[in-house]
Curated annotation (Swiss-Prot):
This is Protein Wnt-2. The gene is WNT2. Belongs to the Wnt family. One of its GO terms (molecular function) is cytokine activity. Transmembrane segments: none annotated. Residues 1-25 form the signal peptide. Palmitoleoylation is required for efficient binding to frizzled receptors. Depalmitoleoylation leads to Wnt signaling pathway inhibition.
Amino acid sequence: MNSPLRGIWLWLPLLLTWRAPEVSSSWWYMGATGGSSRVMCDNVPGLVSSQRQLCHRHPDVMRAIGLGVTEWTSECQYQFRQHRWNCNTLDRDHSLFGRVLLRSSRESAFVYAISSAGVVFAITRACSQGEVKSCSCDPKKMGSGKDSKGVFDWGGCSDNIDYGIKFARAFVDAKERKGKDARALMNLHNNRAGRKSVKRFLKQECKCHGVSGSCSLRTCWLAMADFRRTGDYLWRKYNGAIQVVMNQDGTGFTVANERFKKPTKNDLVYFENSPDYCIRDRETGSLGTAGRVCNLTSRGMDSCEVMCCGRGYDTSHVTRMIKCGCKFHWCCAVRCQDCLEALDVHTCKAPKNADWTTPT
């Protein structure tokens, strides 16, 4: 028998442990500080003490993390390029994304996952390139191994992804581990899913040795795939993200809708439904879609109907320079002409009587 109190009990732990997140700075801002690691460590407000200690103790790792911010934010913007919210970052905002990620939404889940993955990727790459004193190539990949093609020798430089994951967990999760509220648990879950996603795409690369390429001896190593593979994977997880509530003892999650499966460690989880992101809203941090380019012939999320939220669009006639008449010349060049191409660009209208700032 289903009790009417059952729903109350499901939500009670969430209500008891929920606190509205505050707009605070994050390690995400490290990519904007520049300068030395000391400048970075001392000028990113919001770092907890253990993060600052790691920052001062490992300046070379912090440089890698700071450079990596540009990579994972660019990947986020690529994945959301055809959506109303396009993972836009805010200049001079210490939180990098503003208020939009205060909501425990699918978008927050994705950003926490992709940022955590980005840290693993950046640190691991820096280790392999000899840019970090405390790590190098994977020391476990030594001696011989065997695969479907036979025996091989471990050689080259296998990416030390275990070090990247370990450091990322210690640094990225530090602030969330200090909190016991629902949002902290959500962030920790999505951080872990992001870290695991990078390791999923480790690939074995080999080089043949022998007379005339006979491959009588193979040397192999493990290498991370391009970060786009991780971005594409997390994008699929975003589209299949699972809405959850806190369980009764407040230590984990249960699905909000019993028809859906329980989330695994690889799934992204969220608590709140997303806003529609149609209009500029200071409360939610949405910049709206006025001025966004839309696709008149598309039926997807980038269509003018969906992107512009039914407000209509303006059309501009523009010209652009393109390469044309390209010919191959022996040997070995391709020569092209410069041509002008005329095209129509469609941009979403702003809401009527709105105090509007066109998003960038």
